[in-house]
Amino acid sequence: MKLPVREFDAVVIGAGGAGMRAALQISQSGQTCALLSKVFPTRSHTVSAQGGITVALGNTHEDNWEWHMYDTVKGSDYIGDQDAIEYMCKTGPEAILELEHMGLPFSRLDDGRIYQRPFGGQSKNFGGEQAARTAAAADRTGHALLHTLYQQNLKNHTTIFSEWYALDLVKNQDGAVVGCTALCIETGEVVYFKARATVLATGGAGRIYQSTTNAHINTGDGVGMALRAGVPVQDMEMWQFHPTGIAGAGVLVTEGCRGEGGYLLNKHGERFMERYAPNAKDLAGRDVVARSIMIEIREGRGCDGPWGPHAKLKLDHLGKEVLESRLPGILELSRTFAHVDPVKEPIPVIPTCHYMMGGIPTKVTGQALTVNEQGEDVVIPGLFAVGEIACVSVHGANRLGGNSLLDLVVFGRAAGLHLQESIAEQGVLRDASESDVEGSLERLNRWNNNRNGEDPVAIRKALQECMQHNFSVFREGDAMAKGLEQLKVIRERLKNARLDDTSSEFNTQRVECLELDNLMETAYATAVSANFRTESRGAHSRFDFPERDDANWLCHTLYQPQTESMTRRSVNMEPKLRPAFPPKIRTY
């Protein structure tokens, strides 16, 4: 079957913050760029980012990018790569002021400068008093960011393919990535997008869990595509559980609520975070706050309600005026999903899967990496990854709030700047043969031919329940081993699942089945990685190994898809402009 071909200098898969920032940089340089998105670009999941962009602008107090770097390294539980963290914190202010000049409508201080609010894990002067470092557009910062970047991409003539679903990467005989195949959801047409550079910006995969702040589109498509192309993934055991998802709904309640002065209560009305983090209290690292809430619930101090035990987030003491100006979106979400009015009563919250710290290992320039037999990093020609799908790794074992939007903008821009130079300089990659392109259609053909078998909805439900029960906030060896065995069975069931809808136009069931393949591979890589790391670090907290073990585990974990085995990869402790921050005990 010969596919129609569309040819571009670069194809960017995913139109969230990172994908649109990379595409913008490529288009501005005069290269041709295709931007593929399975939803309309401003519906990408970046739209749900609420609190802000953490960056050392120094608008509310004296600030310094090195203080921001210290907090990020500490937050990562010391497995964030310090060269990448340094680059992000140092170039952050420049990248954010560029957004301001593009027209991003930030909230303002009285003197007209960008408003910055306190967020968890932030400090002045290397661990001193609480800092206010998160630049915000009320509590709709992601929404403002997406609209700004979308307008700029239109202005710079990026070719946008809206509601196109990327199927798989296409590799040539040399192992270089030379584009991808994609399905037009509207017509059912399949096209080969041929490109000299392919940028994965597909976002997270929170839908492997039952309870998540992530939209239904966050199905790990980039992880699945990478693994099927033989690309390893790093630190997949590291999943952030946001302390405050609305109980029963999973909808995110921004950390900005606590930054503005909100606090958590147990059923006795006690501010319990004072016991777990005496200094930072409710603004400790997210992993610390999430574990504290779960301990309160396990020990019987959770609040009761129709959605099961939970904590309460109190905001009413801030007053109606502050809430309406600083947190208007939270008022709306709480009234809709929790049926409470935060102006009068607290919001019921529970830790909820939020962010994938792991992903495709990359350089600061977004170039995807694999590891050779000697354990050395090797660049994969033609493949880039930016945003949540990438593991640069600036977040290590625990991301700080507000650093995700900074990651999107800084590394989307960095990949674009690199491609600006390299596309012009590099020779032409060898074309993929017809059989290379056809290889990327195997999954689509399998689903199209499977008319009998199990209902994929039941399989997805089993997958999500397995992950929620065995790989959540607290983990334990026996449960995780059992969970991995269950996933092996679910994986076999998936091979014989059926597709009922045979239509070509707007066949959403077909897309959901293809997404399920990606959820499966992401969940499996997570389970293998979580069983491998025998310590507690950041978001990976094990009852059977409660301590951090720097002697054996101050490293990244790498899942190799060909052998389904694990290896270690060293953490970069060599920033270029200042001495490294050595590992120490992490307290808040």
UniProtKB/Swiss-Prot annotation:
Please give the catalytic activity noted in the UniProt record.
a quinone + succinate = fumarate + a quinol
Residue positions, PTM Tele-8alpha-FAD histidine: H45
Pfam family of the protein (one): Succ_DH_flav_C
Tell me which EC number(s) this protein carries: 1.3.5.1
UniProt-annotated binding residues for substrate: H242, T254, H354, R399
Naming one, the record's GO cellular component terms include: plasma membrane
Active-site residues annotated for this sequence: R286
Gene3D superfamilies, alphabetized = FAD/NAD(P)-binding domain, Fumarate reductase/succinate dehydrogenase flavoprotein-like, C-terminal domain, succinate dehydrogenase protein domain, Succinate dehydrogenase/fumarate reductase flavoprotein, catalytic domain
| Transmembrane regions | none
Name the top EC class. oxidoreductase
PANTHER family hit by this protein: SUCCINATE DEHYDROGENASE 2 FLAVOPROTEIN SUBUNIT, SUCCINATE DEHYDROGENASE [UBIQUINONE] FLAVOPROTEIN SUBUNIT, MITOCHONDRIAL
Q: Which family does it belong to?
A: Belongs to the FAD-dependent oxidoreductase 2 family. FRD/SDH subfamily.
Q: Indicate what this protein is called per its UniProt record.
A: Succinate dehydrogenase flavoprotein subunit
